[in-house]
Amino acid sequence: GGKLLFMSDYLEQQIPFGMYINESIKSGQVYWSWGMDLGTNFIGAFSFYLLGSPFFWLSMPFPSSWYIYIAGVIYLIKYMVAALAAFLWLRRQVNGENAALIGALLYAFSGFQSLNLIFSHFHDVVALFPLLLLAVDLWVQEGRRWPLALSACVSLLTNYVFFVGEVVFLAVYYLVRWLIPDVRRGLRRLPGCAALGALGVTMGAVLFVPSVLFLLSNPRTQQHGVSLLFSKEELLYLVRSMLLPASSMHSPDVLMETHWASCALWLPMGGLVLAVIYCFGAKKRDWLRRLFLLCLLATLSPALNGAFLLWTQSGYRRWFYMLLLLAALAAARVLDVPEAY
């Protein structure tokens, strides 16, 4: 086989941070970090990266000097968990296991994953996200409580910034998937869903509260306000991200200079073609069709796109993995019953 080379943030942040967190925890220096600049809050500095990730904690039994080697193995585990978690959710949405398996692999190896290889902690979030949707479905359909509370807690601990976007998505998902088609059951299950989510947040408060207090002192979090339209170059970049595998973010191309927004909406084996076919073949009131088109519309406007980051002036598209999971489900449904489309 060939060689997979990592660069930029992976070598400058991910590996050094992993080694440093390992050393700090084992030495008991978990309140204040003297190794970052002139010193900073340890939890506030590293809770966005690796501190609360269950994948990172797999490396803790080993010496910090081993992390550079263990990180590659952990990367493989993240892809396996992403595929397994997606399969568990997709399997409930289609009849055939093969279609669910293909959809799970499309999600796990999506363009969003390959584009963000230098940001290894993004893959933690992608791997665990399908479990949140599965937990919501289990609560609504079967009344199972703990999966939702635990998945909310683990997702929050893994990355509180991405969790904010996931809460926004889950609110829209619940509305389109459960409330609109069946108002009575949707309203009956809604208070419990909110309470279980709040319980999960409470359990994750050990990292969440210090992180929020740390962020409040950062002036960049106060920069709100977005425009209504993307530029022509950004729209072309978005369209290309749906049709072709993403190019490297740190290398300029014909459309943009360096572009760190994580704009990638490509699935292996044809991009979003199968998802588009599904939208044309599905009923107009189909929940997946509605939700997919609604999220696709959100990608076209900075105002709607910014809702997943509380309208901060970042311009990031780092919620696209959620849309790609919907696209993977649409593709799985087409492959499950191709004659229907």
Model feature map: region roles:
Residues 2, 64, 142, 178-186, ...:
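Transmembrane helix-loop junctions in multipass membrane proteins, especially transporters and channels
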Residues 91-95, 139-143, 179-189, 279-288, ...:
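Membrane-interface helix-boundary motifs at transmembrane edges
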Residues 1-93, 98-130, 154, 158, ...:
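Active-site lumenal/periplasmic loops and adjacent helix-entry segments of GT-C-fold
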